[in-house]
Swiss-Prot record:
The chain crosses the membrane at residues 32-52. It comes from Rattus norvegicus (Rat). The gene is Asphd2. Its cofactor is Fe cation. Its main location: membrane. Coiled coil: none annotated. This is Aspartate beta-hydroxylase domain-containing protein 2.
Length: 343
């Protein structure tokens, strides 16, 4: 009936008037159920338009930029006190999940969706995972679901790399001591970075910073650099991978903070570990030992401090990020792609 009426209808003002009159009469003739149904459909349509409008793509957000920050004094930080609007620890980026999902789709198109279930789930429900995590563990960029959780890992979690690092303890220590001779009271030697702390001084000498090699520093420590290339589980191709020498001066306290992800294990090889130095992860304190590796999940709330005297000298560790042992090979490849530096 309606189809015949539309075909026969004259496209004119008179026809428009007749159309409106017919529509009003049709509504009057309808029973209450039909009117309610139409009203519900109209509400659903309006809600859908609003929802689609809210999810229009945000401006491009580089994953790498979310991990970087500079404080008010221009000192690179990476943990706290950063005031950069691009720092993930200081601001929330609504566009990040969309960017990650786009990267995952691009990876799956090139390779395969096989084995991507946890990553897909993690990206899709990232906001819920991060907001529902207990306050003791809150990775600030990416949470991979269904990974075993513990503040500290046993040494055999990455046995090969731990043993290799410990066998090369003396070589790394010698290269550090050669570097440290350049320190003076008035200037920071080239290649070193100072990090913001509420008290004391914290310096790092980067070999890999957020997945990017630092060639000038690597050339100064060739044996340490070659050692990094021999590690089987070193994260070197995405923004969650770092390797450096970390120095805490006496009297230094690092503010409690969370790392960006739970897909990695942070490994500290003790180079110089005077008394009064401690690492606290998830409320559990541990002490470093020279020539020994300490493995922990830095997505837990953690801090470090050096309460020794000036005569004790600095606390020095060689730090490197290793893959969490329960992240599968296919997932590692995909995460390297999704979180590639500069992507």
């Amino acid at each position: 009936m309606w189809l015949e009426w539309l075909v026969a209808w004259s496209w004119s003002l008179d026809g428009l008037r007749d159309c409106i009159a017919t529509g009003i009469q049709s509504v009057r003739d309808c029973d209450g159920t039909a009117v309610i149904t139409v009203a519900c459909l109209l509400v659903l349509f309006v809600w859908y338009c609003y929802h689609v409008g809210r999810e229009q793509p945000r401006p491009h957000v580089s994953v790498n930029s979310l991990l970087q920050g500079v404080d008010a004094n221009g000192l690179q930080n990476g943990s706290m006190y950063c005031q950069s609007p691009e720092c993930v620890r200081c601001t929330h980026h609504d566009g990040l999940n969309q960017k990650l999902y786009h990267n995952l789709q691009e990876y799956a198109k090139r390779y395969s969706w096989s084995g991507m279930g946890r990553i897909h789930k993690g990206i899709r429900e990232q906001g819920r995972y991060l907001s529902s995590q207990p306050s003791i563990q809150k990775p600030e960029v990416f949470f991979l679901p269904d990974l075993p959780t513990t503040p500290y890992f046993p040494r055999d979690a990455q046995k090969h790399d731990v043993e290799l690092l410990e066998r090369n303890f003396q070589a790394i220590l010698c290269e550090f001591e050669a570097l440290y001779k350049a320190f003076s009271n008035c200037s920071l030697p080239q290649g070193w970075k100072v990090n913001s702390t509420p008290s004391g001084e914290w310096f790092t000498f980067d070999f890999v910073s957020q997945g990017v090699c630092v060639p000038r520093n690597c050339r100064k420590c060739p044996r340490t650099y070659r050692l990094l290339g021999s590690l089987r589980t070193c994260i070197g191709n995405n923004v969650f991978g770092n390797a450096c020498i970390s120095v805490l001066s006496p009297g230094t306290v690092i503010t409690e903070h969370y790392g960006p992800t739970n897909i990695r294990i942070r490994c500290h090889l003790g180079l110089k570990t005077p008394n009064g130095c401690e690492l606290v992860v998830g409320g559990e304190p541990q002490c470093w030992a020279e020539g020994r590796c300490l493995l922990f999940d830095d997505s837990f709330l953690h801090t470090s401090f050096h309460e020794g005297s000036a005569e004790d000298g600095p606390r020095v560790v060689f730090m490197v990020d290793l893959w969490h042992p329960n992240v599968a090979a296919a997932e590692r490849q995909a995460l390297d792609f999704i979180f590639a530096p500069g992507r």
